[in-house]
Curated annotation (Swiss-Prot):
Function: High-affinity transporter for external inorganic phosphate.
Protein name: Probable inorganic phosphate transporter 1-5
NCBIfam families listed in its UniProt record: 2A0109
Bilayer-crossing regions: 25-45, 71-91, 100-120, 132-152, 162-182, 212-232, 295-315, 351-371, 374-394, 405-425, 444-464, 486-506
The keyword 4Fe-4S appears for this protein: no
GO cellular component: membrane
Organ and tissue specificity: Mainly expressed in shoots, First throughout cotyledons and hypocotyls and later restricted to vascular tissues, mostly in phloem. Present in senescing leaves. Also expressed in floral buds and sepals.
Family classification: Belongs to the major facilitator superfamily. Phosphate:H(+) symporter (TC 2.A.1.9) family.
Pfam families: Sugar_tr
Membrane topology (Extracellular): 46-70, 121-131, 183-211, 316-350, 395-404, 465-485
GO biological process: phosphate ion transport
Membrane disposition: Multi-pass membrane protein
Additional remark text: Although related to the sugar transporter family, it does not transport sugars.
Gene (name only): PHT1-5
């Protein structure tokens, strides 16, 4: 690596933790706060949408979204997210992280508002408009994954880099919690202001006209935190690593870094001949043998583990309400009015978020640079597997009223170890182990693989969790394999996560250039290197 360029990057790695590091966490993290709020808040209002738009006169049960509509409403944002992760991940490497960072946020703001303003002449028309806006909302959310992770990894020092990236991702927990709290406040306010009988007393009167405002307000609220951080995102300079390693402008990199971090460094413009173009192997692209040789197993590890994790994680999160209903923790729908049902579902999800989801994220932040990424991910998958089997095998035991608290504790622990485990580490590792010129792209590919898993979870679990008894299925659904067997399947998915975690290298305590071998590339070396995974002595070829 050219001397001046290496000085800039070494200064970043050695920089003390400063106020701007925390500012960057908040700026990037508020995007993830919004991401989680928008992606998970829909699960709080889907039952209300069914009551409002798909009520059937003389039916003994409140209206529910038809299977295809429910699948679309729950899953379309993930389809957009997958596309956004691939597109903006690639664009972040081509144009720079900063240039496209504001676009993703504005998409989130506009489409959050659009979701709440969905319209149509018929029920299906309203749902189609909602799905349109939620697809593009997901597209913006998708871009935030690779860009936020890459920006934070390239700003951070090597000592606390894992904690900084994990802290950005941990804002998801607050987003999920905020979704539940906002929904609680809105539904409680409307429930007290517009009294309504239960469905079994008055099927039509149980859904007051004002209920249509509840879901719209909940969805539109997601625009506020994103809008508040737009200005600060636009003020962030390009990362020094992108400017020095990809744009090849060391002088600008040093200048940008000095503006935000307390590091005095003067760099001169470097000749192009000093760049890593001296050896063709060191300018390899994504679809080359050289990339496959150096990083193929790494990319396979990050994509498969994120895919498997999101099948279990998103199916569990999106359909908490169905699991709670199945074990009897949430009363039968006909015993509540429409708005009170939103309140009840929100209360359950908020409790789980408070007890399991949020603490898990911040345990990762606290321990990731101590225990390492590999250990935390492996531990998380192991405990998720154990708790899923513990929920599924004695499932009938948990359905008894006196055992419901035990079920909720086990379920909370599953969510805890998902977040103090692979849900955080699958986000952190791809931002560290790939070269700067491909870092955002590879993170986008890994994240898109995760969202493919989320789509499988969102669409598959919706049908699979239906009772095998056709008389007990929700309206319009074919018989499924039941909640118990669905939980068994998720436990097996988590076990596969343990296996594929063995392909993921440890990146704790190393500089980004050391992990990705860019320091070797820049110096023109051609040494075969191995990366030690965790502290086990096991090595993965790179």
């Amino acid at each position: 690596m050219a001397k001046k360029g290496k000085e800039v990057l070494n200064a970043l790695d050695a920089a003390k933790t400063q106020m701007y590091h925390f500012t960057a966490i908040v700026i990037a993290g508020m995007g993830f706060f919004t991401d989680a709020y928008d992606l998970f808040s829909i699960s709080l209002v889907t039952k209300l949408l069914g009551r409002i738009y798909y009520h059937v006169d003389s039916s003994k049960k409140p209206g529910t979204l038809p299977p295809n509509v429910a699948a679309a409403v729950n899953g379309v944002a993930f389809c957009g997210t997958l596309a956004g992760q691939l597109f903006f991940g690639w664009l972040g490497d081509k144009l720079g992280r900063k240039k496209v960072y504001g676009i993703t946020l504005m998409l989130m703001v506009l489409c959050s508002l659009g979701s709440g303003l969905s319209f149509g002449h018929s029920a299906n028309g309203v749902m189609a408009t909602l799905c349109f806006f939620r697809f593009w909302l997901g597209f913006g959310i998708g871009g935030d994954y690779p860009l936020s992770a890459t920006i934070m990894s390239e700003y951070a020092n090597k000592k606390t880099r894992g904690a900084f990236i994990a802290a950005v991702f941990a804002m998801q927990g607050f987003g999920i919690l905020a979704g539940g709290i906002v929904s609680l406040i809105v539904s409680s306010t409307f429930d007290h202001a517009f009294k309504a009988p239960t469905y079994e007393v008055d099927p039509v009167g149980s859904t007051v006209p004002q209920a249509d405002y509840v879901w719209r307000i909940v969805l539109m609220f997601g625009a506020i935190p994103a809008l508040l951080t737009y200005y600060w995102r636009m003020k962030m300079p390009e990362t020094a690593r992108y400017t020095a390693l990809v744009a090849r402008n060391t002088k600008q990199a040093a200048s940008d870094m000095s503006k935000v971090l307390q590091v005095d460094l003067i760099a001169e413009e470097e000749a192009q001949s000093n760049s890593n173009s001296s050896n063709p192997n060191f300018t390899f692209g994504l679809f080359t043998r050289e990339f496959a040789r150096r990083h193929g197993l790494h990319l396979l590890g990050t994509t498969t583990t994120w895919f498997l994790l999101d099948i279990a994680y998103y199916s569990s999160n999106l359909f908490q309400k169905d699991i709670y209903t199945a074990i009897g923790w949430i009363p039968a729908a006909e015993t509540m009015n429409a708005i009170h049902e939103v309140f009840t579902v929100s209360k359950a999800q908020t409790l789980i978020a408070l007890c399991g989801t949020v603490p898990g994220y911040w345990f990762t932040v606290a321990f990731i640079d101590i225990l390492g990424r590999f250990f935390i991910q492996l531990m998380g998958f192991i405990f998720m597997t154990i708790f899923m089997f513990a929920l599924a095998i004695p499932y009938d035991h948990w359905r008894h009223r006196e055992n419901r608290i035990g079920f909720l504790i086990m379920y909370s622990l599953t969510m805890f170890f998902a977040n103090f485990g692979p849900n955080a580490t699958t986000f952190v590792v791809p931002a560290e182990i790939f070269p700067a010129r491909l870092r955002s792209t590879c993170h986008g590919i890994s994240a898109a693989s995760g969202k493919a898993g989320a789509i499988v979870g969102a669409f598959g679990f919706l049908y699979a969790a239906q009772s095998s008894d056709s008389e007990k299925t929700d309206a319009g659904y074919p018989p499924g394999i039941g909640v118990r067997n669905s939980l068994l399947m998720l436990a097996c998915v988590n076990f596969l996560g343990i296996v594929f975690t063995l392909l993921v290298p440890e990146s704790k305590g190393k500089s980004l250039e050391e992990i990705s071998r860019e320091d070797e590339e820049q110096s023109g070396g051609d040494t075969v290197v191995e990366m030690t995974v965790a502290n086990s002595g096991r090595k993965v070829p790179v």
